[in-house]
């Protein structure tokens, strides 16, 4: 779709939110020297951070746009009495947690803590995905491209600053 700024910025917001999570995950590993909250083991074309490889990075870039395409045009539409953006954020988050459980079962994603895994999926839901969707859909619905640029620019700017400070300068991640 040409000039669909809503989808483009929703996708960038989703992707930027993932980068933030990947950065703090790397910091967890740095500070505890035991394990990250999640890890990306195995073969990859390029491991970016301990829980993020290039394949996952591209998946999150595409996912934000793909999930944005599911949004009804009517922002105020309610489904079963629930605002559609909230309901879709919850449903999509549950779906993503389910996919992560499958990836963990085949060894493509590691979890080393009892509080983050298939037996305790609520944190993956609440921290790992729900904020991604809520922010992505919020950006999607902003009434001007300027607001979208400022919001996504802030998200990506925080990510870049954290990567420079904790990665390039301190070499913690």
Residue positions per predicted region:
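Aromatic-rich, lipid-facing transmembrane alpha helices and their immediate juxtamembrane interface loops
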Residues: 1-173
């Amino acid at each position: 779709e040409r000039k669909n700024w809503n989808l483009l910025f929703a996708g960038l917001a989703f992707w930027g939110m993932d980068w933030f999570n990947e950065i703090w995950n790397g910091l967890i590993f740095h500070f505890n020297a035991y394990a990250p909250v999640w890890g990306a083991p195995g073969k990859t074309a390029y491991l970016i951070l301990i829980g993020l490889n290039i394949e996952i990075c591209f998946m999150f870039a595409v996912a934000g746009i793909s999930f944005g395409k599911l949004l009804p045009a009517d922002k105020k539409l309610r489904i079963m009495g629930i605002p559609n953006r909230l309901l879709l954020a919850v449903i999509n988050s549950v779906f993503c947690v389910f996919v992560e459980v499958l990836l963990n079962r085949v060894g493509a994603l590691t979890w080393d803590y009892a509080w983050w895994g298939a037996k305790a999926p609520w944190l993956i839901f609440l921290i790992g995905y729900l904020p991604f969707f809520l922010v992505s859909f919020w950006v999607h619905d902003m009434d001007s491209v300027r607001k979208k640029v400022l919001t996504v620019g802030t998200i990506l700017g925080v990510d870049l600053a954290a990567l420079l400070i904790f990665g390039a300068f301190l070499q913690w991640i």
